[in-house]
Amino acid sequence: MRMAFERTVTTDKSFDEAVTAIEKKAAEKGFRVLYVHDVAATLAEKGFPRDPLKIVEICNAKYASQVLAKDAKISLMLPCPISVYITGGRTHISTMLPTAITAFFPEAGIEEVAAQVEKTVLEIIEETR
């Protein structure tokens, strides 16, 4: 059985409206936007044009500190990425489920923190759509 590791929603917002809404909603929920990667622009610069795609990196220092105290290698999966992209003319918002991290670090005991972060991240994308 395949483990669910992501959630994707479709929105009627334009691409730019969705990116801006994610940034605003993340701040409202206590997360800081660390960086927005314009993947489409980067690929286009290298000769690989594609439909719009940005990755919004968000982080909550309290939660990050808690999981990193358990295992520094969890940093490989931080910060929380939220992707906004266009496929088939529709704007989509996707995120990796933070609880999926627990499968990679079962001894870390981060299930409770991961569940709290996941609840908030899912609220961010649902309230943004």
Go through each PLM region and give its residues.
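Terminal, regulation- and interaction-focused segments at domain boundaries
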Residues: 1-33, 126
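Residues that cap or initiate secondary-structure elements
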Residues: 13-15, 62-64, 88-90, 99
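Short acidic, gly/pro-rich beta-turn/loop elements at beta-sheet edges
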Residues: 19, 66, 103-105
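Short Gly/charged-rich anion-binding patches and loops
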Residues: 20-21, 38, 70, 120
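Compact, glycine-rich, soluble single-domain proteins
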Residues: 34, 38-83
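Beta-strand/loop substructures that line and gate deep hydrophobic ligand-binding cavities in soluble
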Residues: 81-106
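Well-ordered alpha/beta subsegment
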Residues: 104-129
